[in-house]
Amino acid sequence: MNSFGRLFRVNVFGESHGASVGVNIDGIPAGIPLTQEDFLPDLERRKAGAKGTTPRKEEDLPFIKSGVFNDHTTGAPITILFENNNTRSTDYEKLREFPRPGHADFVATHKYGGFEDYRGGGHFSGRLTLNLVAAGVIAKKILGPGISVKATLKEVAGLPDAEQGLEAAIAAKDSVGGIVECVVEGLPIGLGEPFFDSVESTIAHAVFSIPAIKGIEFGAGFAAARMKGVEHNDAILDASGKTATNHAGGVVGGITNGNPLVFRVAVKPTSSTPKEQHTLNIKSGEVENFSVKGRHDLCIALRVPVVLEAVAAMALADFMLLEQRSNRVFKN
């Protein structure tokens, strides 16, 4: 559904062209310093406007509606709203007849019987990643300064140079995908459970809430399939668990081993592309040529790093609370 987490529980709501999108977060320890300004750096990283991103610009100011008093968390659920002001819903009126390839238009209509808000992708829109970033800001505070969560763009359109990848997309007049890597340092040994609540499965669960994510790998990932066992195994060097290599990506048996947690995600090309495509005309029953109008990202991967950090922090903050490594009352 629309919720994630066991103790640090995140619930997202809203639609792209509705009045607002927002997030409700339960399980936050009391006493964490928190103001509107704390959210701004990460929200700014997610914003549109840079080369290769959508021209749609919103202020993206977080309005804290509950759970904060005297600039500190109270221990009650926190609700944060983001207003939608720069919408152009007329761009989407034609979509009732032409479901966009690669988007949720067709399946959403079938699942919700045509009652869904289709404007701008509705509840399926990447705009709802604002909610994830906001939750991630709080999650990072729970993790504390000793744990760093950092994601970087590694590849655009198959090229390690993002600028070159974007230029290739502009020349082709088409959208492109990318690869983003996240590294978490400072984690204690022992987070995670075997099987269904492993660190990998929990992070993957959160990661796939980000629209456009099509794959994830930890450590050596798919390259491990081409390695020998002695090559892939990480030799343990000392009692702290430090290893000579990190092909496991910081997780063994679903449990953190004290080495950096490393994973990468594949981000598909933006489904809304300037190129003419063909799709079913629901009204006529015929497959017809179709082009997507509106304001869209050329490469959504450019805006994914801060969102990836957020969902990783959400998952790890939940583990920290479950392991009682974070107190219910925050202490500096």
From Swiss-Prot:
Cysteine pairs bridged by disulfides in the record: none
Residues annotated as binding FMN: 123-125, 253, 268-272, 295
Subunit note: Homotetramer.
UniProt KW keywords: Amino-acid biosynthesis, Aromatic amino acid biosynthesis, FAD, Flavoprotein, FMN, Lyase, NADP
General function of this protein: This reaction introduces a second double bond into the aromatic ring system.
Protein known as: Chorismate synthase
Family that this chain belongs to: Belongs to the chorismate synthase family.
Cofactors that this protein relies on: FMNH2
GO CC terms in record: cytosol
GO biological process: amino acid biosynthetic process; aromatic amino acid family biosynthetic process; chorismate biosynthetic process
Originating species: Chitinophaga pinensis (strain ATCC 43595 / DSM 2588 / LMG 13176 / NBRC 15968 / NCIMB 11800 / UQM 2034)
The UniProt record lists the keyword Transferase: no
